[in-house]
């Protein structure tokens, strides 16, 4: 195995199942990506700014142990599922049977799969090379209340075009909800540096999904017209985030799903975020119908990044491509039930660069 790829190896005992958690670094051009198979987490993405200075642009930790025993954000850099985002009431129905999932959010709901979601499991490494890693996980029938043995394969690739590409594939032997996403927190000036309120954001969406006080979708698919959620043209994130808008109050800022204006079933433009200070930008492309944009409203500086800087309020953002939240309880939302004989697929591309301005 390539010595430039594997940079450390350690053993963990997690949930009574001993596996090895490895750390890998991939390289392509002037971009490097460090991941661990514990939760299929992104630990760092190093890219140049407009002056050529190389810096990690996602919030992370130096060691796997810090992810196993987090002092703050549990989902930092993780793959989340089997159902990303929230399940209202921690329950859903499939084929006439009601299933109950763990309550780990606001005292009533399930967030990102539960306590033992895929972010808290050690994935098997199928293959690894300088620019790609393939991970596999079996999520057994009944774990955290989800039906079916869910077989998952995920490929992380650094392309020659300076892109971080994620490809998901899943199958099941019993009908079950499936909606994976990834949770890197982007800090385009480096960990703990500056505020995302200064970032310029554009989202390809004419509608978004309003939420209640527990961040559960109300069932409405609302137009962004005339609201602080209209990013069809670029706006500074901080321009309207402090408005007296009930939706912003509910989430303490932005933490909502935008319904992407898709024209095909393939990979299309989702959003573009740029930082005027570093010149860095990240552009997101995906084949999924939704984007959860979270403006880092609950970071408080208690947790530190891999560079030792505190991860403060709104110092990073999450851009999560996915199907719509709580879709399993909303028949009018994009369907999330995977049946035997079907394949769940999902492609997300994070394209990095430096603005010419």
Describe these PLM feature segments.
Residues 8-9, 173:
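Residue-level detector of transmembrane insertion/anchoring sites
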Residues 18-357:
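An exposed, glycine/acidic-rich loop-and-rim segment of catalytic or binding clefts
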Residues 2-8:
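Sec-dependent signal peptide recognition
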Residues 9-17:
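Hydrophobic h-region of N-terminal signal peptides that target proteins for export
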């Amino acid at each position: 195995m390539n010595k430039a790829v594997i940079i450390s190896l350690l053993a963990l005992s997690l949930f009574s199942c001993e596996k090895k958690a490895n750390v890998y670094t991939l390289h392509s051009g002037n971009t490097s990506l460090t991941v661990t198979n514990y939760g299929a987490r992104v630990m760092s993405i190093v890219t140049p700014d407009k002056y050529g200075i190389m810096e990690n642009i996602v919030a992370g930790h130096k060691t796997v142990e810090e992810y196993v025993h987090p002092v703050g954000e549990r989902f930092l850099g993780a793959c989340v599922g089997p159902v990303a985002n929230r399940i209202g009431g921690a329950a859903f129905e499939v084929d006439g049977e009601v299933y109950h999932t763990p309550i780990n959010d606001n005292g009533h709901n399930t967030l990102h799969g539960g306590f033992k979601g895929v972010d808290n499991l050690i994935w098997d490494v199928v293959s690894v090379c300088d620019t790609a890693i393939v991970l596999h996980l079996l999520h057994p029938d009944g774990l955290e209340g989800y039906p079916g043995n869910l077989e998952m394969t995920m490929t992380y690739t650094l392309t020659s075009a300076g892109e971080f590409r994620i490809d998901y594939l899943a199958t099941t032997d019993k009908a079950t909800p499936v909606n994976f996403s990834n949770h890197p927190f982007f800090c385009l000036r480096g960990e703990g540096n500056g505020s995302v309120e200064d970032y310029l954001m554009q989202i390809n969406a004419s509608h978004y999904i309003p939420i209640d006080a527990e961040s559960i979708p109300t069932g409405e698919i609302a137009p962004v017209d005339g609201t602080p959620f209209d990013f069809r043209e670029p706006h500074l994130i901080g321009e309207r985030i402090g408005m007296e808008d009930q939706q912003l109050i509910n989430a303490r800022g932005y933490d909502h799903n935008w319904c992407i204006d898709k024209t095909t079933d393939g990979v299309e433009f989702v959003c573009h975020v740029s930082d005027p200070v570093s010149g860095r930008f990240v552009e997101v492309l995906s084949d999924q119908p939704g984007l959860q944009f979270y403006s880092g409203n609950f970071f408080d500086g208690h947790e530190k990044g891999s560079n030792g800087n505190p991860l403060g309020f709104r110092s990073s953002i999450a851009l999560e491509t996915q199907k719509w939240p709580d879709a399993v309880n909303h028949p009018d939302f994009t369907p999330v039930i995977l049946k035997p004989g079907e394949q769940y697929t999902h492609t997300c591309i994070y394209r990095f660069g430096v603005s010419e301005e």
